[in-house]
Amino acid sequence: MLDTLLINIGQLLTMDQEDGLLRREAMNTLPVIENGAVGIENGVITFVGTAEEAKGLQAKEVIDCGGKMVSPGLVDPHTHLVFGGSRENEIALKLQGVPYLEILEQGGGILSTVNATKQSSKEELVQKAKFHLDRMLSFGVTTVEAKSGYGLDDETEWKQLEATAQLQKEHPIDLVSTFLGAHAVPKEYKGRSKEFLQWMLDLLPEMKEKQLAEFVDIFCETGVFSVEESKEFLLKAKELGFDVKIHADEIDPLGGAEAAAEIGAASADHLVGASDKGIEMLANSNTVATLLPGTTFYLNKESFARGRKMIDEGVAVALATDFNPGSCPTENIQLIMSIAMLKLKMTPEEVWNAVTVNSSYAINRGDVAGKIRVGRKADLVLWDAYNYAYVPYHYGVSHVNTVWKNGNIAYTRGEQSWSTATI
């Protein structure tokens, strides 16, 4: 007997097409079962099909979804989850048009958050991050990548990674930990970036032994780390058994996209300034292009990543919030979906695949997350919507009704959710 059977699902978005990264036409295709049903037993999906096919199945609990839509739990593959403080004091500078790198030089930006994170205890960081994770869950996210990078010293970086490990045990959302010690060059290492990177590399063996990080990342940008420094650093991390990511071409077209494809990074993230050659190389690689349009929006910039061109050229595109206190302080991945549709010229179908299938591959979770398939974890979202296009179309609010994590209800809007209204 099933534990739970969901029936009367108007649109069941299984996302279950070909295995592997989705590109071109596959990104614009959504496998949808009309009038669907999903069976759950011991936290695992055991039935996926139509309501007609589900007749005769027995379950301890039968949930009538009222003709609404069900999707897999969403995957946010790029966040800076664990940090201290906030940076609303920088809003005035941004409105005045002060460039981010100039704010950084003045001790703001990342360095401001570094100081606040250093001054926070691990428990304070955990409690703050739980608040943000709760919000992410309420937007339908069940798997999240979490970076360190607000320490720039060994003690604080360890503290962030240990906080992430504690959150993994205490919060229902699945976390994927990334070490981003190379997020900026500390003042005491100004002009000595190679020495700083070696210091970061010296931390990796113990980090690997304690399993505190799965990925290593670096901020490859003008005034931070060069392409050659980034490649050398990430290749050494790969030699130690880590998978790697790269903050690439966010501000200037340095060649970060090319570097990511060349070294076989799991993802290249941002890519606002990615060159035509970089896009071509990504298209011919298994590196996911994780685009972060919420950051471009919040920084009030005119030029967004060329998502349309990337998809047309064959790049596997994912979307993420880039949740962080400075350049994208939002947990709302649904808003990111809307911005991607409007500013990156992505179709609703492409947007959905970019926050499920491709985003799961960007963090090496393609075999466990992002799809509704028999044998996978029952990470599901019931939406207060009757079709998938409605979610990115009606922007700025959450359309989530209920979230199941491993077959258990982890979030419900409850009585606040409409039940009799029609769209």
Swiss-Prot record:
Binding site for Zn(2+): H78, H80, H247, D322
Protein name: Imidazolonepropionase
Names of the cofactor(s): Zn(2+); Fe(3+)
Residues annotated for Fe(3+) binding in this entry: H78, H80, H247, D322
Entry function: Catalyzes the hydrolytic cleavage of the carbon-nitrogen bond in imidazolone-5-propanoate to yield N-formimidoyl-L-glutamate. It is the third step in the universal histidine degradation pathway.
The organism's taxonomic lineage, starting at the top: Bacteria, Bacillati, Bacillota, Bacilli, Bacillales
EC number: 3.5.2.7
Pathway: Amino-acid degradation; L-histidine degradation into L-glutamate; N-formimidoyl-L-glutamate from L-histidine: step 3/3
Entry GO CC: cytoplasm
Gene: hutI
Cofactor note: Binds 1 zinc or iron ion per subunit.
Listed InterPro entries: Amidohydro-rel, HutI, Metal-dep_hydrolase_composite, Metal_Hydrolase
